Design a protein with these regions (language model features):
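Short, solvent-exposed turn/loop segments enriched in Gly/Ser/Thr/Pro and often Arg
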Residues: 160-162, 213-217, 411-419, 473-481
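Non-catalytic accessory segments of hydrolases
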Residues: 2-186, 207, 441-454, 462-473, ...
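Substrate-gating cap/lid region and adjacent catalytic-acid/histidine neighborhood
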Residues: 272, 278-448, 457, 534-543
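Serine-hydrolase-like catalytic core of hydrolytic proteins
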Residues: 89, 93-270, 308-332, 402
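Non-transmembrane alpha-helical segments in soluble domains
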Residues: 122, 153, 190-193, 197, ...
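A structural signal for well-ordered alpha-helical segments within the folded catalytic domains
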Residues: 45, 100-104, 187-194, 220, ...
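Surface-exposed patches in mature extracellular/periplasmic domains of secreted proteins
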Residues: 208-210, 268-272, 276, 409-411, ...
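Juxtamembrane boundary at the C-terminal end of a transmembrane helix
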Residues: 547-549
Length: 549
């Protein structure tokens, strides 16, 4: 049973229509594909559901996005565009909004009290393991953010996810004609940036001062875009929240997901897949959306080794602010159904993953675990915190800095009020957007002053490339000291956080560009298999007790 908020999302979809009569010109912006009329509240104009590419349907299914057609029509920009095809999931609230293939739309928030015609632009790409998420999630609403920072223009972007945005189709007959399919979601993001480059000045934005930022898969996206040739010149700065380069795939690692698509769709060729209706695709997606998909290191769009691309200076002209949360993995306590399934399933996964390592790395992991305190489940969580999130971010920062790239790092420790979550994955989003009443990850309403500090840091970085505030000096990152801003109510700088831990696990990053063994998703098979095993064991014990007594 979904709650009232999700029920409201399910029924709130509406199409933006052509405006035939009069409209308020002060609420409109003229773009090459039409004039868009927004809605105003508290002097913040929201333009929602603006198309930035042709709908990727029909012959354009699984094709790279194409430039949207020109238009002289006047359109409403009142409603979010559709959410990309995905499985409904309680914490991915956009999944309860209307879904569809036609999902390439963006939202823009502008404060009309600011008359500056060249304002910094911040473009947000949502997270969701590259398989979920959308602009309709209320957590990403930009009203409060732009109300507090009138000189900033905020944009949120929809892009194809899961089997529509990150699937290798080369294993099917005719699939050779779809070489971009494994990275379509990223190409969608680039097309949105192209549209903004051409049109954001109509909203008062400066096309030469664009900061892209994202969390989780969105953070991964904004780490990859700087090393993609097609994205060059479209943005100046990057803020990566709990993302990084670790979760990408080789061609071989993409094949199991393609095999599942073939199995459940019964398709033997691209002709078969293209003949399927949207409803049929959604039904197939329900069966395979539980598995992780990541962008593919194809050597064409994305370098085969993203770290080397940073090391070679491919992104040296981009300013980067990057960081992770202290207890990222605790997020999955909620995703996996509570502390009990988390407590029983994670050790099974950990043992399976460690069994794949060579003896040297097994010994290092064992030493790493012995150096931690607390219950074994939280020590296991700390291992995944490091290998999935923090260490890849440090490696990326080191490689970027070696070539003179301006870099800032943070470590988020402000906890969630939800039980067992601590400073979990996604907890910072309510603070960043200023949506403190949205407590889905924070549990309680966050501290207003701390939220203002975080937003000031993010927006200062977008304005000038330095996140320092009037009260807090944020030192630039160096390879030697690894200067890091600890983000909490008492923000402060620390150097070389958990240095000894990092040294023990550093070889794993060299060995595995993609620590696929360490990746988690919402319905990961190991969790349900382990839960079933536990349930069967309990049943056997109960049966034995009944027989004995």
């Amino acid at each position: 049973m979904i709650n009232d908020g999700l029920e409201k999302l399910k029924t709130s979809y509406a199409e933006n229509e052509i405006i035939e009569g009069e409209y308020d010109v002060s609420l409109s912006s003229k773009c090459y594909n039409g004039t868009f009329v927004g809605k105003v509240e508290d002097d913040v104009i929201a333009f929602k559901g603006i198309p930035f590419a042709k709908p990727p349907v029909g012959e354009l299914r699984w094709k790279r996005p194409e430039k949207v057609e020109e238009s002289k029509n006047v359109y409403q920009a009142y409603h979010n565009g559709k959410t990309p095809i995905q499985t409904e999931w309680k914490t991915e609230r956009a999944s309860y909004y209307r879904q569809g293939e036609d999902c390439l739309y963006l939202n823009i928030w502008v404060n009309r009290t600011c008359k500056d015609e060249a304002r910094p632009v911040m473009v947000f790409f949502h997270g969701g393991s590259y398989g979920w998420g959308g602009t309709a999630d209320p957590l990403y609403d930009g009203h409060n953010f732009v109300l507090s920072h009138p000189d900033i223009i905020l944009v949120t972007v929809g892009y194809r996810t899961g089997m529509m945005g990150f699937v290798d189709l080369s294993y099917l007959e005719g699939g050779e004609d779809y070489p971009d399919a494994p990275n379509l979601g990223l190409l969608d993001q680039i097309e949105a940036l192209r549209w903004l480059n051409q049109n954001i000045s109509s909203f008062g934005g400066n096309k030469d001062n664009v900061t892209i930022f994202g969390e989780s898969a969105g953070g991964g996206s904004v780490s990859i875009l700087p090393i993609m040739d097609e994205a060059k010149g479209l943005f100046k700065r990057v803020i990566c929240e709990s993302g990084g380069l670790a979760l990408t795939s080789s061609k071989e690692e993409c094949k199991p997901f393609t095999d599942m698509l073939i199995e459940h769709s019964k398709a033997k060729s691209m002709k078969d897949l293209l003949s399927m209706s949207e409803e049929e695709l959604m039904a197939v997606n329900e069966k395979i959306n539980m598995y992780n998909v990541f962008p593919q290191r194809d050597g064409r769009l994305i370098p085969e080794n993203p770290y080397h691309a940073y090391e070679e200076g491919k992104a040296k002209d981009i300013d980067i602010l990057i960081g992770t949360n202290a207890n990222e993995l605790n997020y999955w306590v909620g995703e996996l159904g509570g502390i009990i399934p988390y407590r029983f399933s994670m050790p099974i996964k950990f043992e399976n993953d460690i069994a794949k390592l060579d003896e040297k790395n097994k010994a290092n992991v064992k030493k790493f675990m012995k150096g931690l305190s607390g219950h074994s489940i939280w020590r296991i969580s700390e291992f995944y915190n490091e290998i999935m999130f923090r260490l890849p971010s440090i490696r990326q920062s080191d490689d970027h800095k070696k070539n003179g790239g301006k870099t800032y790092m943070y470590y988020w420790t402000e906890p969630s009020g939800l039980k067992f979550r601590k400073a979990c994955h996604a907890v910072e989003l309510a603070y960043v957007f200023g949506n403190l009443d949205d407590t889905i990850y924070t549990g309680d309403r966050g501290d207003e002053q701390f939220a203002q500090t975080v937003q000031q840091m993010w927006t200062n970085f977008a304005r000038c490339g330095n996140p320092s505030t009037d009260d807090i000096e944020w030192d630039e990152y160096t390879v030697e000291n690894k200067e890091t801003m600890v983000l909490c109510k008492d923000c402060h700088m620390e150097n070389n956080i958990k240095n000894n831990q990092r040294e023990l696990l550093s070889d794993l990053l060299d060995k595995f560009i993609n620590p696929i063994y360490a990746s988690l998703s919402y319905n990961v098979p190991f969790v349900w298999k382990s839960i079933i095993k536990i349930f069967l064991i309990i049943l056997i014990i109960i049966a034995i007790i009944l027989i004995i007594f």
